[in-house]
Amino acid sequence: MSHEIKDLNNYHYTSSYNHYNINNQNMINLPYVSGPSAYNANMISSSQVGFDLPSKNLSPQGAFELGFELSPSSSDFFNPSLDQENGLYNAYNYNSSQKSHEVVGDGCATIKSEVRVSASPSSSEADHHPGEDSGKIRKKREVRDGGEDDQRSQKVVKTKKKEEKKKEPRVSFMTKTEVDHLEDGYRWRKYGQKAVKNSPYPRSYYRCTTQKCNVKKRVERSYQDPTVVITTYESQHNHPIPTNRRTAMFSGTTASDYNPSSSPIFSDLIINTPRSFSNDDLFRVPYASVNVNPSYHQQQHGFHQQESEFELLKEMFPSVFFKQEP
């Protein structure tokens, strides 16, 4: 068996090869091959496939290669196109033409084919990528937005410059004193000091400690007359003068209109003042300037509450203040 020479061209195929013969009107009739002489029985027509097939007979191996050679590539098969006449999107619309050349030798055939895919009507549009348009539009927007931001920043800078140009009114006072910082009723905080040209005396800067008050002042001693202090105020106070509680209560009061029973400060004095103290300590207390009128207490003698307060006053203050005038 091993020394026998088989002639492939004259080899007769068995009837088992008949499974390629499919009797269907809608499908392609493949040839029934029983040997080389019977190969030209049924050929694939070009109208059924859509390609120009060679008219010459091929061997089974050539037909097998022909079947794979005619298959379009994936990029050609799935090239979409637009049917303008019907208005439908056809993903399989292509026109192909095949130029085949047959080289026959020992029952083998080689086919070289060219497949031409017709350009779709929207090929120019396909070459035009939408990403490029979006990139250009984005650049235009960035340029436009950047220009608007620049204009806004310029406007803000202009408004700031205008606000800086508006200077607050200044008032200067010249006072002959040995004290550099004079008391004016307001509370100040020193935030800087600067040397003055052609003057041995520095200039001090103060700011009002009240919230939301922008008043500033600067104090400097005149180099021409060292006894003169120049105080310059900038802006105006938007709040009243912060005064002390005791000075506010006793400013403008006299002994005739002072009522010890109705004053809350006087009751606080009775509660919080210690019982034992010297006469020197009494004169240091601001309440020592109060002069109690004895006739007033005689008029209020009928009220027990006022009598008790009067007794406490006798215990706290010396008897000198309660002597009746002749």
Swiss-Prot record:
| Cell location | Nucleus
One cellular component (GO) term of this entry? nucleus
Enumerate the GO terms in the molecular function aspect: DNA-binding transcription factor activity; sequence-specific DNA binding
Null-mutant phenotype, please? No visible phenotype under normal growth conditions. Mutant plants show increased resistance to the bacterial pathogen P.syringae and enhanced susceptibility to the fungal pathogen to B.cinerea. Mutant plants display increased sensitivity to salt stress.
Name the source's superkingdom.
Answer: Eukaryota
Q: Listed disulfide bonds for this chain?
A: none
- Keyword Manganese listed? The answer is no
- Stretches the record annotates as Disordered: 115-172
> Where DNA binds (residue ranges)?
177-242
Query: Could you tell me which SMART domains the record lists for this protein?
Result: WRKY
What is the first-listed, main subcellular location in coarse terms?
nucleus
Q: Which UniProt keywords apply?
A: DNA-binding, Nucleus, Plant defense, Stress response, Transcription, Transcription regulation
What family is reported? Belongs to the WRKY group II-c family.
Query: What task does this protein carry out?
Result: Transcription factor. Interacts specifically with the W box (5'-TTGAC[CT]-3'), a frequently occurring stress-responsive cis-acting element. Functions as a positive regulator of salt stress response. Binds the W box of LTI78/RD29A stress-response gene and directly regulates its transcription under salt stress. Functions antagonistically with VQ9 to regulate sodium and potassium homeostasis under salt stress by regulating the expression of downstream SOS (SALT OVERLY SENSITIVE) stress-responsive genes. The DNA-binding activity of WRKY8 is decreased by VQ9.
Q: Subunit composition?
A: Interacts with VQ9 (via N-terminus).
**Which named protein is this?**
WRKY transcription factor 8
Show the taxonomic lineage.
Eukaryota, Viridiplantae, Streptophyta, Embryophyta, Tracheophyta
